[in-house]
Each structure stands twice: as C-alpha cells, then as structure tokens.
C-alpha cells in the first residue's frame, strides 16, 4: 500500500484529504500540507495523499487556511492529476529551479 495511506504524521494538517469541485469553476481541497507553486494556469500542492497538480485557466487562490490545510481555487479547471512519488520529485525539482 502507498505510504501516504499508512503515515500518521504529527503535523497540524488533518490526515483526511477531500477535493470538492463545483461546476469546474471552484475547488475546495482539504489535507493540503504545502503549496509548492501556483500561477494562473497551474497549482502544485503537496497533500497528505501525495502531490496534486491542478491545471486550468485564470486560476486564483481564493482561500488558504494553513492550520486546517484547506485551499480554495477559483477559475476554469481543466484537470486534476496526482503525481506519483517519482513524478512529484521531478515536478518539485522543475518548479524549484524555475522559481529560484
């Protein structure tokens, strides 16, 4: 089983992870540990279940609650993709280099 399902971390972010989309225009995501990067076309989020890429058009962060691990995104959503551990490391490396 994936290590994300087995880990019980001591962080303040709840271990539960939910994604709620309303009409492809509004996303509420819980279980977010860290916002790796974001712009108007893509958000890269580290969640308790792994790296999550949200791609779309005119994306905006409407709410960020660090203590509860909740992110709200507004805009036209094209896709949501969970990256496996190897892809997540590659994506993090790419974005880390890009935004240094």
UniProtKB/Swiss-Prot annotation:
Residues 1-14 have a biased composition (Polar residues). GO terms for biological process: sporulation resulting in formation of a cellular spore. Coiled coil: none annotated. The keyword Membrane applies. Induction: Expression is sigma E-dependent and negatively regulated by spo0A. It comes from the Bacteria. Gene3D superfamilies: 2.60.40.2000. Required for sporulation. This is Spore protein YabP. It comes from Bacillus subtilis (strain 168).
